[in-house]
Amino acid sequence: MTIKSRLHHILIGVDDLERSRAFYRDVLEMQEVDRPPFKFAGLWFRIGDNDQHLHIIVGEGAMQRTGRPNNPQDVHFALRVPSYRETLDWLHTKGFREDLPADDLRSLMLRPNSITGHPQIYILDPDRNIIEFNCESLD
């Protein structure tokens, strides 16, 4: 079988669901969507305007990045966005800054001239999960 579809969802582990709800809903402005009545707590958020989702559960051990800095070579997920400049400006309004140490939860790691050919911005969520904004252009 060949997989010819697209990514359906990403699952990350967190310590505090309500803190994560506030971050993904209020800071990143993702839409929370209903999830089935599993026997464990969690959250689902829509990624973009399609049926791709971010699934969040309380995780333990290896799922957690406790004490680890913003490092694009570590496990992360990437969100495709149109503009580097607009995304950077938007993240600044949310309190993120590039002059903070890499282990600060509001640090921005910027790669406007990434070797990948796509400008990149990296941030941390409250549980130190790394989020990449993979930009279509610099403008």
Regions found by a protein language model. Give the residues of each.
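Vicinal oxygen chelate
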Residues: 15-18, 77-127
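Conserved catalytic-core motifs of GNAT/GCN5-like acyltransferases
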Residues: 31-37, 101-103, 135
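N-terminal beta-strand motif that seeds the catalytic metal site of vicinal oxygen chelate
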Residues: 1-18, 75-79, 137-139
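Exposed loop/turn and edge beta-strand positions of beta-sandwich/beta-sheet ligand-binding modules
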Residues: 39, 73, 117
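Short beta->alpha transition motifs characteristic of CBS
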Residues: 114-117, 134-139
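Core segments of cupin and vicinal oxygen chelate
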Residues: 13-54
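Helix-adjacent hinge/juxtasegments
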Residues: 57, 63-81
